[in-house]
């Protein structure tokens, strides 16, 4: 399963030292930049978070790699 990475909110005290965490899903902007439609993502069971507005390059790269792997599998068949 593919998991998105998002930034943590800034805390007043350094309770959590990590800058990133695993998100609930990919944003619509990230899907669009990687070439996925919402229907394709749902068929592949890629999690989507409609509330997120940000787009992180790391997540776009993950989605592009996933799309390339799917195209290679289709060509092999």
UniProtKB/Swiss-Prot annotation:
GO molecular-function terms, A-Z: structural constituent of ribosome
Keyword tags: Ribonucleoprotein, Ribosomal protein
Superkingdom of the source species: Archaea
Family annotation (InterPro entries): Ribosomal_eL13, Ribosomal_eL13_CS
Endpoints of the signal sequence: none
Record-annotated disulphide pairs: none
GO BP term (any one): translation
A GO CC term attached to the entry: ribosome
Family listed: Belongs to the eukaryotic ribosomal protein eL13 family.
Name under which the protein is recorded: Large ribosomal subunit protein eL13
Source organism (scientific name): Sulfurisphaera tokodaii (strain DSM 16993 / JCM 10545 / NBRC 100140 / 7)
Organism lineage string: Archaea, Thermoproteota, Thermoprotei, Sulfolobales, Sulfolobaceae
Gene: rpl13e
């Amino acid at each position: 399963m593919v998991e998105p990475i998002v930034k943590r909110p800034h805390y007043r005290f350094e309770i959590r030292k990590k800058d990133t965490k695993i998100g609930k899903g990919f944003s619509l902007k990230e899907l669009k930049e990687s070439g996925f439609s919402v229907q394709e993502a749902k068929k592949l069971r890629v999690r989507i978070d409609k509330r997120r507005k940000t787009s992180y390059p790391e997540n776009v790269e993950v989605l592009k790699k996933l799309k390339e792997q799917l195209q290679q599998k289709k060509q092999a068949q």
